């Protein structure tokens, strides 16, 4: 967009700390070239400015001839807004929209937006008593256990059955890391750090935390957002790479809530679905890895071992989950950054946390560790690349189980890169991501699913829940009945659908009954 087509008449502009007041025909191109100052102004658009709601304000962004880009922060531009001058000739555009001819009024017409940021995460049990209900919430998610449509009425009863069965072993894991997950505490700290980072960038926000499977649930965060009167929302899942089982599941919950609420359905929302490509994230990961490599006697001989959370192959091949491609690209970007710093270590990627008898993304972390030991690798640096917070999969699975396996397999020197947590450069980059996402905020697109549609019929839902609960109760109390049901269920399912180990539905059937 050239300077002529992007110019914007402004009125009621005052430079703080200066006696100068700009004329009403002052152009944005002049504003961008101003020295560092604090600017407030108000405006109202008319004409053919292509925005969804002409009553909304504008976010002005400036780009310079050297390729840099910056944003005059704030919505409705009622400031105060800090803008640092850039080197090179500057031209401007308004948000991500096309600008034509439009007028501005001298009186203030815009109302400040109240910006909210919603951080989404998995959640985790904070005490051992929380483990079983947490697991129930996890397995009751249809994006985790993808039952065939014919058997969806079993979702909640089977979640109860599986969570009861798995709780004792899971409790052992949480007991080994202090009796509960630190995920909520760390995520709360990240939220506070992000709020401060945004404030330093002259963006006043409320930051909320919404967990998918434990407190504070996403539903609780949304209710607080409504009470606070938020007028523009950025949703930031704390998963660098997108998967239908993480970010996808959380977005599905949001879509359902927004569809059923008049206030929420009109709330402008921007969702950052993935952010693994961001330069700040890549550099932050490289910083941590570079620091850990220095702890080895011979850093150049260390094998860099990326361990990512796995998903069933069927998610990728049948459901179109981009997780595998995004993960591989993420690893490539991190290694490119390290290479630019003169670090050329060998590296490999493996996937952890698989369960059940069917194929997950390969190679598997435990198998690769054994192979590396057999090949004579003596030094290894584990990098948990799916996680930005410490939790059971880093503190127990990697630090205990995989470390023990690695040392047992012949690896002598073990190191592990810490999760990003509240790393300052990482948090600053998340703040930039939020600011960049604001101009694209629109009402959340409606989405319907057959599962949600069934839930709207209370009579049908009650029948399904009753039947499934009775069946699960019988199976839980009677091992013989459980085995009979298992054998007949698998036999009939195979006859109907055929044995295709990559089918996500068949995977969960086998997972539940084997």
Curated annotation (Swiss-Prot):
Biological process according to GO: heme biosynthetic process
Location (main, coarse): plastid
Tagged with keyword Iron-sulfur: no
InterPro entries in alphabetical order: Ferrochelatase, Ferrochelatase_AS, Ferrochelatase_C, Ferrochelatase_N
Name of one Pfam family that matches: Ferrochelatase
Enzymatic reactions: heme b + 2 H(+) = protoporphyrin IX + Fe(2+)
Gene Ontology MF annotations: ferrochelatase activity
UniProtKB keywords: Chloroplast, Heme biosynthesis, Iron, Lyase, Plastid, Porphyrin biosynthesis, Transit peptide
EC id: 4.98.1.1
GO annotation, cellular component aspect: chloroplast
UniProt keyword Cell division present: no
Protein location: Plastid, Chloroplast
Pathway(s) per entry: Porphyrin-containing compound metabolism; protoheme biosynthesis; protoheme from protoporphyrin-IX: step 1/1
Family: Belongs to the ferrochelatase family.
Function field: Catalyzes the ferrous insertion into protoporphyrin IX.
Protein name as catalogued: Ferrochelatase-2, chloroplastic
Source organism of the structure: Cucumis sativus
Gene label: HEMH
């Amino acid at each position: 967009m050239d300077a002529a087509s992007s110019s914007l008449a402004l009125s009621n502009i005052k430079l703080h700390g200066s006696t100068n007041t700009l004329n009403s025909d002052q152009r944005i191109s002049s504003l961008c070239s101003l020295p560092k100052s604090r600017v407030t102004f108000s405006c109202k658009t008319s004409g053919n400015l292509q925005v969804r709601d002409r009553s909304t304000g504008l976010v002005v962004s400036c780009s310079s001839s050297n390729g840099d880009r910056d944003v005059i922060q704030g919505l409705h531009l009622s400031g105060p807004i800090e803008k640092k001058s850039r080197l090179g000739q500057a031209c401007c555009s308004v948000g991500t929209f096309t600008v034509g001819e439009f007028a501005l009024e001298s009186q203030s017409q815009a109302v400040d937006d109240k910006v909210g940021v919603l951080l989404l995460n998995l959640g985790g049990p904070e005490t051992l008593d929380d483990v079983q209900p947490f697991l129930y919430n996890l397995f009751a998610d249809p994006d985790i256990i993808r039952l065939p449509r014919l058997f969806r009425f079993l979702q909640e009863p089977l979640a109860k059955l599986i969570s009861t069965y798995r709780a004792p072993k899971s409790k052992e894991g949480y007991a080994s890391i202090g009796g509960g997950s630190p995920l909520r505490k760390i995520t709360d700290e990240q939220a506070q750090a992000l709020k401060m980072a945004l404030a330093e960038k002259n963006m006043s926000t409320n930051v909320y935390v919404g967990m998918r499977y434990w407190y504070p649930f996403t539903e609780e965060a949304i209710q607080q957002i409504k009470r606070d009167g938020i007028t523009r929302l950025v949703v930031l899942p704390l998963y660098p790479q997108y998967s239908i089982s993480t970010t996808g599941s959380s977005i599905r919950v949001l879509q359902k809530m927004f569809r059923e609420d008049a206030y929420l359905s009109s709330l402008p929302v921007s969702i950052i679905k993935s952010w693994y490509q961001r330069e700040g994230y890549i550099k932050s990961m490289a910083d941590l890895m570079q620091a850990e490599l220095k702890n080895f006697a011979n850093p150049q001989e260390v094998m860099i071992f990326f361990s990512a959370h796995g998903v069933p192959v069927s998610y990728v091949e049948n459901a179109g989950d981009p997780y595998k491609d995004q993960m591989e690209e993420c690893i490539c970007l991190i290694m490119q950054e390290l290479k630019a710093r003169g670090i050329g270590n060998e590296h490999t990627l493996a996937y952890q946390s698989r369960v059940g008898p069917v194929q997950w993304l390969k190679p598997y972390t435990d198998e690769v560790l054994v192979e590396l030991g057999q090949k004579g690798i003596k030094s290894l640096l584990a990098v948990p690349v799916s996680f930005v917070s410490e939790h059971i999969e880093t503190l127990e699975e990697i630090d205990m189980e995989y470390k023990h396996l690695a040392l047992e397999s012949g690896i002598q020197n073990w190191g592990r890169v810490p999760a990003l947590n509240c790393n300052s450069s990482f948090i600053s980059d998340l703040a930039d991501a939020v600011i960049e996402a604001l101009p694209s905020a629109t009402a959340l697109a409606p989405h319907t699913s057959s599962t949600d549609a069934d839930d709207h019929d209370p009579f049908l839902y009650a029948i399904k829940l009753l039947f499934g609960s009775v069946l699960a109760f019988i199976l839980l109390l009677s091992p013989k009945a459980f085995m009979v049901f298992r054998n007949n269920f698998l036999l009939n399912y195979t006859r109907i659908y055929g044995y295709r180990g990559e089918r996500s539905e068949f995977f969960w059937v086998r997972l539940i009954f084997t």
